[in-house]
């Protein structure tokens, strides 16, 4: 048993740890949302991930993403896997350095219990989320997380299998830059929604 799982045993029952340890989470995008969602879920007992991102780590990512200066230039999915393995050596990550689109999304995440939308551009986020409507997967998305001191984050259940978090108003741009506090807040809400779904659905 790893040090992390030993410590989690103080807070979670063996049954809960087993349930979390069996779940596989797909994450589309390994940037500010995706990298932090993965880190938060790992620290909460998730051990299996599918990480999809074609980009490389840049210096401008370090203000809000779960990477170190020495990761700059590396593929995000692989760099994230390495960071996660430092916390939990037994983590299982399948990494894909590709762009997610309508032709490959379902196959990439086919065996996942939950799919997390963690893409950057509004158009890509909307298109990705629309792919899953009626497919039967549980999807957790985000919308509106730029700036600082702006409207509070919300969690909206948009049907039985779709949750979206954010302020639903503030896109990250020049006037409302993506800064760590609100990005992390959205990522934490996404991770919490994933945990709640896994633990509650498996108990019912």
Please give the residue ranges for each predicted region.
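Glycine-rich phosphate-binding loop and adjoining beta1-alpha1-beta2 segment
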Residues: 51-87
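Residue-level detector of alpha-helix initiation sites
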Residues: 32-33, 46, 56, 122-123
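Glycine-rich phosphate/adenylate-binding loop
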Residues: 21-24, 106-114, 118-204
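Residues at the starts of beta-strands that form the adenosine-phosphate
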Residues: 24, 47-49, 92, 138
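Non-cysteine beta-strand/loop elements that form the S-adenosyl-L-methionine
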Residues: 49-54, 165-167
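N-terminal charged helix/coil linker that caps or initiates catalytic domains
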Residues: 1-25
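A structured beta-alpha segment of the ubiquitous adenosine-cofactor-binding alpha/beta core
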Residues: 75-112, 119-122
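Glycine-rich adenosine-cofactor-binding loop
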Residues: 21-42, 50-53
């Amino acid at each position: 048993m790893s040090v992390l799982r030993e410590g989690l045993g103080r807070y979670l029952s063996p049954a809960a740890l087993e349930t979390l340890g069996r779940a596989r989470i797909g994450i589309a995008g390994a940037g500010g949302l995706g990298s932090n969602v993965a880190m938060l879920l790992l620290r909460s007992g998730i051990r299996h991930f599918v990480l999809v991102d074609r980009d490389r780590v840049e210096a401008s990512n370090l203000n809000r993403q779960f990477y170190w200066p020495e990761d700059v230039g590396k593929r995000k999915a692989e760099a994230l896997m390495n960071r996660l393995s430092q916390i939990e050596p037994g983590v299982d990550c399948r990494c894909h350095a590709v762009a997610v689109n309508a032709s490959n999304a379902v196959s990439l995440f086919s065996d996942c219990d939950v799919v997390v939308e963690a893409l950057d551009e509004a158009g890509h986020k909307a298109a990705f989320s629309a792919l899953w409507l009626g497919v039967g997967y549980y999807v957790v998305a985000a919308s509106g997380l730029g700036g600082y001191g702006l409207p509070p984050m919300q969690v909206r259940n948009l049907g039985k299998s779709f949750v979206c978090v954010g302020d639903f108003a503030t896109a990250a741009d020049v006037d409302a830059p993506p800064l760590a506090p609100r990005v992390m807040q959205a990522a934490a809400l996404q991770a919490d929604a994933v945990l709640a779904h896994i633990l509650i659905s498996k108990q019912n």
